[in-house]
């Protein structure tokens, strides 16, 4: 049994295929590099290949800095079959490689020039000669998707099943890149559909992973039928790959066409195709597998003690998928894997707070414990989902679990002990949570400094503080002077509480206020950003005070016209906020947050803080 917490997100096959993909990208880059000729040199070469007289006088030993001979250049710069024949008769070797590792035949194939390919082959070029990466000319034609070039090579006896340095045949490459017509041609010339690559991958594995349905169908045709249940070195079958990457049409084709697919087969990690669909949030694929093949896969656990339900909770971004799996009435929401961990453990460990809330609302038991399988049998290390969240620094989830703590539990609501442990308590911020918060805050501040226009950057030395005119949990508000203007200064305390810090609110508030410009919204003057201990937001000072002060402290009586002026100005400010490209909702519109320039005189101003603003997507 494997340790869930050490479950790899990438398999060995994934790592290998990434390297294979990179190698083919490099191959194309090297081919393109060979095709790059300096403009002056290119003009001269075109003149040579465009004139029989000039060509007859050319130095046969000529070559470029990249090691391109005249034979290579003939394939790039407008040469013809006559030039090829002449150069080869005069002794230029077609086997010579450029510094990037390609013959003239490779370059002619990459340029898709059937005439030059034929001429080179008739002149004695080795059709099976390998260049960079163990690639033959047929491999190059397949990578580029050049149907005509591939056809000429096959007509002249190219080995259709030859393998390159990563043991890919041309058919592997055609399936990988989705070259349907080239695939059809290769099959016509007898390509082996079941030959294995370096990690046991067949062309059908590649087509299934990349989502090429038509190629998958070609590979399954009678006469060259691929083994639909063939396993690679990690026991993946094609259904594993199309399920993992969400290729619903291929999943449906494999399951519905009497192909004798084994839908519940497992890889070396114990994953069924349904597991992989759920680990990657492929809801439609998961539904298709269950609807066609039944619910057998739902009860299977992989080596990390996870059912498909656990897998969906590990992914955590599709509550609809989790709900669908629970609706099958096969797995209980509190089902524990062999190591004891539940879907709630998985969601907590990966920080999926919305899923955690959904599971708790639907009866998930936060007191169930998991055991660490890496410990020896004599040691008992039982952990609740809260401990898993705490370990990963997901402090918001720890706080949420506090809210949902069962009333019969005797521990205080703000402290937790580990069941079966030594009674030690956990509290937020967790060590990792604190590090995450600090790292995020530093990044947020740097981004804010970079994005805030320079005229909004203030130094604390530029500000003259006068009397205090307000206070709150964030700090204090002062009346003062800045750049020869009377202003209001909101001075922050640089402390962190719970899971949301003043730094976060400060950055949020500044980033929004700096974009606002309307006569009925308090004007932003600037901010001090140098250090959290000096954080301050400077805004326009409104001399008339708040509407609350006017009505309840000064006991002023407003006439109807003044009330209408105030109401209209507030509405104008709200309309401006709501009609921004990214609309803003003022979530706490009350008398304390409406300020008056002077008694009964417009404009009246809306005051926004990080607590009262809410951004809507455009």
Swiss-Prot record:
Gene3D superfamilies: Ankyrin repeat-containing domain (1.25.40.20), Transferase(Phosphotransferase) domain 1 (1.10.510.10). It comes from the Eukaryota. One of its GO terms (molecular function) is protein serine/threonine kinase activity. GO terms for cellular component: cytoplasm; nucleus. It is an enzyme of class 2 (transferase). Transmembrane segments: none annotated. Residues 463-618 form the Protein kinase domain. Its main location: nucleus. Its cofactor is Mg(2+). A lipid is attached at residue 2 (N-myristoyl glycine). ATP binds at residues 469-477, 490. Belongs to the protein kinase superfamily. TKL Ser/Thr protein kinase family. MAP kinase kinase kinase subfamily. May play a role in cardiac physiology. Interacts with TNNI3, ACTC, ACTA1, MYBPC3, AIP, FABP3 and HADHB. This is Serine/threonine-protein kinase TNNI3K. It comes from Pongo abelii (Sumatran orangutan). The gene is TNNI3K.
